[in-house]
Design a protein with these regions (language model features):
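Hinge/lid segment of periplasmic solute-binding proteins
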Residues: 114-170, 228-231, 322-325, 497-500
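Glycine-centered hinge/linker elements that transmit conformational signals in sensory
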Residues: 198-204, 244-282, 322-329
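Extracytoplasmic/periplasmic solute-binding protein
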Residues: 153-165, 169, 179, 197-253, ...
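Conserved N-terminal structural module of periplasmic/extracytoplasmic solute-binding proteins
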Residues: 2-123, 135-137, 185, 192, ...
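Short helix-initiation/N-cap motifs at beta->coil->alpha
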Residues: 86-95, 194-198, 281-291
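Extracytoplasmic/periplasmic substrate-recognition and gating elements
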Residues: 49, 72-76, 102, 155, ...
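Long, aromatic- and glycine/proline-rich binding clefts that accommodate carbohydrate-like moieties
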Residues: 324-328, 376-443, 474-500
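Short, solvent-exposed loop/beta-turn-alpha elements that line the ligand-binding surface or hinge
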Residues: 45, 130-143, 187-192, 238-263, ...
Length: 500
């Protein structure tokens, strides 16, 4: 996934009411506590006395895999306890921010996309890792895993890439419902849609065959984060950043000027108007939507690889589904999901009183061995190519996911590698954002679709320009031209010119 999209992913999280966040923080109890810690050869600075590492993430379906790592870690380091707290995803940024302010931050935490990583560094949330992350340790990772402006700032390393390059969203197809609607080839194999028009035709056929009880398409946006996932069909249709709206080829936001976004709204609202989308879409959450899909309530769902481990837990008998890349507007993809040098995963808190133990756990989670177990558990790809072998897939849907992941990513430009001061430009969020606009369109509160997109584009462009001007006023050398890479071909890997 491009770092531009990651930046937008949890943006809405900071909008949660502070009072509600305080209540949630006070009432949240660790969901998993498994003993784990220092080895016979204890890391420097860590005593052999019992130590407890506070670990935060927002992973639910990935939880059992992390629990297994805690168990294995404990077997090797019996004096350390990893106390894991799994927070609610849409509250996570607020809860972490409140913990930082209160001085009660976890020792190790999964880094959220909001605030931006550079802002978290500036706020002093993260501990530099250089004293442990030696050249030898860095060499265990693929080339370009550590990059200035991504996970390194002013020469200091703050995190390591966790996920491997992969489209973070795919289309899941309920094979049983497709077969019931006759959407199969001559051999009886399900014909999964490749284009938007094929999606719409399939959705109509499935809804008709369901007689009012089954629908072609579904999602769950109760937590107000999933509507933009539907918009991600633009990511393979000519939008380099379908979630954030910024286009490096233009050096500006293109919500209105790139016609693909309005094309998608017409397509999606057309499906809604035809009655092909599950009616409860705005009142159920994503986890409920996944159960609906597994129990045959609707036939097509956008989601990530976490769906598969989730179904293994909630609907263990459900295996009759397929995984394909996100359908595109035309016959071929006009763009892809993108990656760039560097990457983000876990971080060690600057407030930790047990930095050596926290690093030990950080290093364990970022080892090749743990990465291989992650892939074998069906949790997705990791940064280490040797861990991402198709032979590790234990089910056909997971093998399909791995194939989609291995084929569906391209390298994007990384102007921040050439101009590190770009990370000092921090645009303010404008509201309503794309989530709010899509919700307004979906509920018919917004009727001028193009006007709403143009307004968002203008507001985002103005925020970007203001942030650049603010950085310049602080004496930071930044040039608006750095945000423009006109020679980027969206269908090919970009070779960074002048990269060191």
């Amino acid at each position: 996934m491009s770092k531009f999209s990651r930046r937008a992913m949890l943006r809405a999280g900071l909008l949660t009411a502070a009072a509600a966040a305080v209540t949630a923080c006070a009432s949240t109890a660790p969901q998993n506590q498994t003993p784990a810690a220092p080895v016979a050869s204890t890391p420097s600075g860590t005593s052999s006395q019992p130590v407890t590492i506070a670990h935060w993430d927002w992973w639910v379906t990935q939880g059992p895999t992390i629990d297994n790592e805690i168990k294995l870690f404990h077997e090797k380091y019996p004096n350390v306890t990893v106390q894991k707290t799994t927070q609610v995803v849409d509250q996570y940024p607020n809860l972490l921010q409140l913990a930082m302010k209160a001085g009660t931050a976890p020792d190790l935490f999964l880094i959220p996309s909001t605030p931006q990583l550079v802002e978290q560094v500036d706020e002093g949330w993260l501990k530099p890792l250089n004293q442990w992350a030696t050249d030898k340790w860095q060499a265990t990772f693929p080339a370009e895993s550590f990059a200035e402006g991504s996970n390194v700032f002013q020469g200091k390393i703050y995190t390591a890439p966790f996920d491997g390059p992969a489209p973070w969203l795919q289309l899941y197809v309920n094979d049983k419902l497709f077969k019931a609607a006759g959407l199969v080839d001559a051999s009886g194999k399900v014909e999964a849609p490749r284009t938007w028009s094929e999606v719409r035709v399939a959705a109509q056929a499935i809804t008709k065959a369901g007689g009012g009880n089954v629908f072609g398409w579904g999602f769950g946006d109760k937590q107000k984060t999933v509507l933009p996932w539907q918009l991600m069909l633009c990511q393979t249709s000519g939008a380099p950043d379908a979630q954030g709206g910024f286009d490096l080829r233009k050096g500006s936001y293109t919500w209105s000027s790139n016609p693909v976004f309005l094309d998608w709204i017409n397509f999606f609202m057309g499906m809604k108007g035809e009655g092909s989308i599950v009616p409860e879409a705005l009142s159920i959450d994503d986890e409920t939507a996944r159960v609906y899909f597994a129990t045959g309530k609707f036939a097509m769902l956008i989601g990530g690889v976490w769906n598969q481990s989730g179904w293994a837990k909630t609907n263990p008998d459900f295996t009759d589904y397929s995984v394909v890349s996100l359908p595109h507007l035309g016959e071929k993809p006009d763009s892809y999901f993108y990656t760039s040098p560097g990457g983000v995963g876990f971080g060690v808190s600057n407030q930790t009183k047990i930095p050596d133990a926290a690093w030990l756990w950080f290093s364990w989670l970022n080892s090749k061995e743990a990465a291989t177990r992650w892939v074998q558990a069906g949790q997705g790809l990791r940064i280490f190519p040797d861990a991402n072998k198709l032979e590790f897939a234990k089910t056909e849907p997971y093998r399909q996911y791995m194939q989609v992941a291995l084929d569906g990513v391209r390298m994007a430009p990384s102007p921040g590698l050439l101009h590190p001061t770009m990370d000092q430009v921090k645009p303010q969020q404008t509201l309503p954002d794309i989530q709010g606009i899509l919700e307004g369109i979906y509920t018919s509160q917004i009727k001028d679709w193009k006007g709403a997109l143009l307004d968002l584009q203008n507001r985002d462009d103005a925020a970007q320009a203001a942030a650049i001007k603010d950085a310049q006023s602080r004496g930071i050398n930044v040039d608006p031209a750095w945000w423009r890479v006109p020679d980027w071909n969206l269908t090919e890997n970009y070779v960074q010119k002048g990269a060191k």
